[in-house]
UniProtKB/Swiss-Prot annotation:
PANTHER family: CYSTEINE PROTEASE INHIBITOR 1, KUNITZ TRYPSIN INHIBITOR 2
Recorded coiled-coil stretches: none
Role played: Inhibitor of cysteine proteases. May protect the plant by inhibiting proteases of invading organisms.
Gene3D superfamilies per record: 2.80.10.50
Organism the protein comes from: Solanum tuberosum (Potato)
Disulfide-linked positions: 41-93, 141-147
Principal place of residence: other
Protein name in the entry: Cysteine protease inhibitor 7
Localization: Vacuole
Similarity comment text for this entry: Belongs to the protease inhibitor I3 (leguminous Kunitz-type inhibitor) family.
GO cellular component, one term: vacuole
Length: 178
């Protein structure tokens, strides 16, 4: 059986519970949903940073699976999950909460639970950052193309999450109960 993914309280991550995903590095911050470009529904997945215009608490997420699993309600390393923002939204935008990676390799919302191309996995790292253990990296896994690390880029002046080719390039993340 694969090991469980743990939050910063040392508790296993559970399907359907709310978490903040945070970069524990100095200057890093929590992941949040933002509207870039006056869209009807916000769809950009960004990371707060320690600079005034990007400070913030983050948008909670829940992890979901497309079907019941032998793993029960616990999230385990390197098993496929869908990541979904948890927030009050209009009926119009209710389908715009699941993460996916777009053609520019940016993490955005608008994915679908059940779509094999919108699966993410969580992998343990050996990093201990500012006293935080349980540090992980996120991977985006398209059905037959393998997985890519989730790193960052500054697309159009925004700190975006993005799928990256370089195996050494990734943003470390910790999970905090929301």
């Amino acid at each position: 059986v694969l090991p469980e993914v743990y939050d910063q309280d040392g508790e296993p991550l559970r399907i359907g519970e709310r978490y903040i995903i945070k970069n524990p590095l100095l200057g890093g911050g929590a992941v949040y949903l933002y509207n870039i470009g006056n869209l009807q529904c916000p769809n950009a997945v960004l990371q707060h940073m320690s600079i005034p215009q990007f400070l913030g608490k983050g948008t909670p997420v829940v992890f979901v699976r497309k079907s019941e699993s032998d793993y029960g309600d616990v999230v385990r390393v390197m098993t496929g999950v869908y990541i979904k923002f948890f927030f009050k939204t209009s009926k119009l935008c209710v389908d715009e909460t699941v993460w996916k990676v777009n053609d520019e390799e940016l993490v955005v919302t608008g994915g679908n639970v059940g779509n094999e191309n919108d699966i993410f996995k969580i992998k343990k790292t050996d990093l201990v950052i500012r006293g935080m253990k349980n540090v992980y990296k996120l991977l985006h896994c398209r059905s037959h193309l393998g997985c890519k690390n989730i790193g960052g880029n500054f697309k159009n002046g925004y700190p975006r999450l993005a799928a990256v080719d370089d195996d050494k390039d990734f943003i470390p993340f910790v999970f905090i109960k929301a």
